[in-house]
């Protein structure tokens, strides 16, 4: 299974999506199909795609390479750097 798919499924079946899905259904949800459908329909898949594209993009690749002191092209290293150091902070407009 490719890296991107493993990460996306981990988010779809993870505690955050599971919690939001349970809130939407009013009960705990353990069914993988229900979790996947909720993840897609609620925008989780689109959000993941945008974050993954940014993590693999040239700007993050440059910052990650600078951080490691060498050219980085490995998707897992880029993803980990983006999620830990490069993802923009969420701002809540009031």
Question: Predicted segment positions?
Answer:
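Polar low-complexity intrinsically disordered regions
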Residues: 1-94
